[in-house]
């Protein structure tokens, strides 16, 4: 059983709009609808985490089988996914997706899910010519993933890394629940980072797999109307 958990609670202040960020359009569909449509062929259930303008987001998708999860306070990506814990089946494979990344393809998600099968955990990364602003994938000498370091917390050497975290991952429900409950706000923002579960999994000797997306455009988040 596969389940999608889509983060859609962001206010999108840089969009300079009163409309919820995920409701802005690409073509004739909202950002969120693109993500839902890409995930549906390979999941059995869809959970969408909402906060800002939640009623308008729900109204946009009337008639679709979606479980709505409310995030009352925005305390980081880890906190957002924590709100979905009651709806996570321990035996399921959870696809963590973002409602403002509309160009993600079903085929990419399928490959990511397949990579997660041996260990129960895989990350989607991409190589960027200019990785400024993105979390870097930290690997050891054997190319195994060790952690993800956010831009604002990275050292000078880590900032030179071009492989970045897209935020999209596939993880077994048992692992996700375990590590979500262990999250602490040990960063400059005082938030709960979802990416911190990577380091926790490494400490548990979980061999985290990865799939490197060929196109940076496919995993690009929409932050401005012009994008």
Language-model segments: residues:
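Conserved core of the sugar-phosphate nucleotidyltransferase
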Residues: 104-188, 206
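Hydrophobic targeting segments
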Residues: 2-6, 32, 45-48, 224
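Catalytic donor-sugar/metal-binding loop of nucleotide-sugar-dependent glycosyltransferases
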Residues: 199-212
